[in-house]
Swiss-Prot record:
It comes from the Bacteria. GO terms for molecular function: ATP binding; ATP hydrolysis activity; transmembrane transporter activity. It comes from Azoarcus sp. (strain BH72). InterPro entries: AAA+_ATPase (IPR003593), ABC3_permease_C (IPR003838), ABC_transporter-like_ATP-bd (IPR003439), ABC_transporter-like_CS (IPR017871), MacB-like_ATP-bd (IPR017911), MacB_PCD (IPR025857), Macrolide_Exporter_MacB (IPR050250), P-loop_NTPase (IPR027417). This is Macrolide export ATP-binding/permease protein MacB. Residues 20-258 form the ABC transporter domain. Homodimer.
Amino acid sequence: MKREAFSPSASSTGAGTPLIELAGITRSFRNGEIETRVLHGIDLTIYPGEFVAIVGASGSGKSTLMNILGCLDRPSSGTYRFMGEDVAGFDRDELARLRREAFGFVFQSYNLLGGASARENVEVPAVYSGMPPAERHARAEQLLASLGLGERSHHRPSQLSGGQQQRVSIARALMNGGRIILADEPTGALDSRSGEEVMKLLRQLSAEGHTIILITHAREVAEMAQRIIEIRDGHIVADPGPSKPQGPEPDFAPHVDRTSSMSDLVEATRTALRALRANLFRSALTLLGIVIGVASVIAMLAIGDGAKAKVVDQISAMGTNLLTVRPGAPNQRGRETTATLVIEDVRAIAELPNVLASVPEQSASVTLRADNTDQRTTANATSWNYGVARNWPVASGTFFSAEDEARYATVAVLGQTTAGALFPGVDPIGQYVLVNNIPFQVIGVMSPKGATPWGQDQDDIVFVPFTTGSLRVTGQRYLRNVTVAVEDVSRIDATQNEVSQLLLARHGVEDFQIRNMASVIDTVSATQNTLTILLGTVAAISLLVGGIGVMNIMLVSVTERTREIGIRMATGARMKNILQQFLIEALVVSALGGLIGVAVGLGTAAVIALFDTPIKYSLLPVVLAFGCAFATGLVFGYLPARKAARLDPVVALASE
């Protein structure tokens, strides 16, 4: 059966009920095989409102006793009852609640957060108790003003004197009510005047009904208390006994109302930013790892996607609705010179359903001459509907017609590269060129096509009618290939099968090959995707290294800020509060690095694009890169955060 949660702020003691009861308390420490007992069977009872001084020399066990009284440490044996409730059964979070709602600590070394202002230091217990921001700001200001520090609420501890820092510590102890003030050598680091002021404050708080437990080695300081308990070698050697209160205990607990999780996150984020500002150079180096990782992912994927888009566009420009029939059986060498395709095959293919155009092609390397200029290029003998099939219009003039083919006209259409080489700065339309010393009249110039994905200049070409070319230019009867344009691209595979069956029936043997441009695009896209993934993986490794850097720095931060963690635990921070704080610090680093990395990655890609490198931006890589950076912070920040949350309060407070 689950025990009902104990709430010290919701409980009150009767006039005759002890506030604290210790019975047979011992505390031992083990170092290897050696066990040292510091406390021996401590019996102690403290009632509400008492001003108790525990006095003893160094090593007497008084600080260990204070740690147990303040629930910073657990006894090795014995019973500790707080308001009748056995503290031994409390878990870490319940002990944190007890410290938060019942105890206020005043330390000899002040134990203030160096990067926070006086007001922010005072507010720490209220942050963990869930007091709304406006209310805790007002209460902190009121407490500081009552202690004479109203004008120094925004000063950091380094800007305050020792006495002022101790008053800030007292104000912090009172923030959540300060039902019990545990003061460990509160005057030890102060001059005599400041020490007297602190003791005056403690006597005043005692008069107001606060229970004061003073730990000191100085007899003259202890004399200011109502009850002096002497401890020596872990034993209580003198105790006049408790004084029962004459009336009910005052209510010290301020109004606390749980704030939303969003408010907790905002406060944790503010604390994280303050911690990062405290070590700007180190934070910048940590950010750099994430920035490089995110920027690399975005830039490399943009380059990979750009290269893929360029290749696909180039292939698409050749026609996505095309089938190319070539002579020669599959895997046959030298199929370019194999004589299997004839013009009758072209006419038969044109009769098939879903065929928009069936275009014969022959080619030969020729020399063109215009005036005194020679140009070595490729002559393509084809039909009048070549431009329709290839989706390649003329830029000027016209393409030859079916009538030109029928009458074996000696007309030519030049590619952009060829036209520019033969007729620089001159309109070639109507001019004559010699194709292997045969005069052809230029009737058109094709629009620019650019290079193929394999680097071949498609504009370095001359087109002539098929009939004329096969008779006077190539001297061939057989075709180099047949280009088949389909009407419905969704049925291109079915049309390919029909063309294959037709040619197989006509030839009686599979002496041809059919290439589907849509399949080529799919293959090239798959290859480019693989390369893009490879680039992204290499970049992701950079992000992984950045994440390891975050974990390394956070582990160092936990080590450096162990004392701060102890202070926060002493003021009531739960394990989840510490875990949340350091996890958010890692996430803030990763998120900032991710945002900067996105900007750097996009900027890098833009600069690379200036050098004619194809770049393609898309939202998905940006989201993935930032998401991975955030996830990296979460994953690699968890271990340091968990380490921080599991620290022992006493060990953490004792660290330097």
